[in-house]
């Protein structure tokens, strides 16, 4: 507990929160261009081939982003929209690609949780 004299000498320091997605520069999403699309393996208890892409953002950052959903058509030079959100079992992957925007198509044949994967409502027969 500081004395009043100590508080007069120097005020209390504000606690600043460190952002978990610095490359977005305080924006909800950012546009970027894929420089490399590849698969990588997750951390220890899990086993899979996770689809990720290296992306150069409009902010100038080069980040690794996860491609959610089953199947994708992304390749080098594809323009994508990137949002924050890490993938727990992939170290260094702190961003997600938004499906159904720009060059990223929605997940084919998806009927549940469609809004998360950029799929339009199916036509009623």
UniProtKB/Swiss-Prot annotation:
CDD domains: Ribosomal_S12 (cd03368). One of its GO terms (molecular function) is rRNA binding. The keyword Nucleotide-binding does not apply. The keyword Calcium does not apply. GO terms for cellular component: chloroplast; small ribosomal subunit. One of its GO terms (biological process) is translation. It is found in: Plastid, Chloroplast. Keywords: Chloroplast, Plastid, Ribonucleoprotein, Ribosomal protein, RNA-binding, rRNA-binding. Pfam families: Ribosom_S12_S23. Belongs to the universal ribosomal protein uS12 family. Part of the 30S ribosomal subunit. With S4 and S5 plays an important role in translational accuracy. Located at the interface of the 30S and 50S subunits. PANTHER family: 30S RIBOSOMAL PROTEIN S12 FAMILY MEMBER. This is Small ribosomal subunit protein uS12c. It comes from Tupiella akineta (Green alga). The gene is rps12.
């Amino acid at each position: 507990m500081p004395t009043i004299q100590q508080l007069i000498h120097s005020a209390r320091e504000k606690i600043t929160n460190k952002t978990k997605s610095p490359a977005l520069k305080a924006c909800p999403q950012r546009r970027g261009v894929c420089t490399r699309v590849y698969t990588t393996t997750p951390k220890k208890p899990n086993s899979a081939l996770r689809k990720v892409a290296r992306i150069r953002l409009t902010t100038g950052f080069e980040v690794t982003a996860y491609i959610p959903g089953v199947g994708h058509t992304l390749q080098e030079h594809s323009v994508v929209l990137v949002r924050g959100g890490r993938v727990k079992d992939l170290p260094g992957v702190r961003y997600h690609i938004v499906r159904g925007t720009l060059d990223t198509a929605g997940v084919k044949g998806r009927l549940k949780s469609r809004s998360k994967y950029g799929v339009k409502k199916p036509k009623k027969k």
